[in-house]
Amino acid sequence: MVYIILGNGFEEMEAVCPCDMLRRGGVQVQFAGIGGRLITGGNGITVQTDCTVEEMDLDAMEMVVLPGGMGGVRSILGSEAALNAVRYAWEQDRYVAAICAAPSILAKLGITDGKKAVVYPGLEDQMGTALMQDANAVRDGKVLTGRAPGAAMDFGSLLLETLKDA
């Protein structure tokens, strides 16, 4: 199971595009909402999630995905349940993926330390000791990162390729 965590203000392209690509590839994906099941993105599109972050089945989780959007990033950082899900995935050697501003969350948790990564241009100073790359999407072991909304398809392709090769 892949969980894509959504908080109000998330970037819609960075959530829906990878979800669509994964589902077309036969991967089971669920949106998990912070604070409820109706989550509104930064551009006003409301998504009904499959579950809340508290209802996620962490043992069944192969990958957790964090879309960007500054509001969504703030929502994730303010949710202990969401942060615990990310920590759990990392500690259990599962895949952890983030795009746009969301890789900064992984940096705050120490997940990108010494790892190749990308982040939304201008946020590189929030990436700690990550090894910043010039690419749309990057994988380093179990850590996958994407640069920006325009990289959503490359990011989704990388997620699918990673899971299909696992």
Predicted regions located by residue number:
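Anionic-ligand binding patches
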Residues: 117
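Short, thiol/selenol-centered motifs that function as redox-active sites or metal-ligating centers
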Residues: 99-100
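Extended, subdomain-level signal for the structured scaffold at the beginning of enzyme domains
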Residues: 1-96, 105-114, 125-166
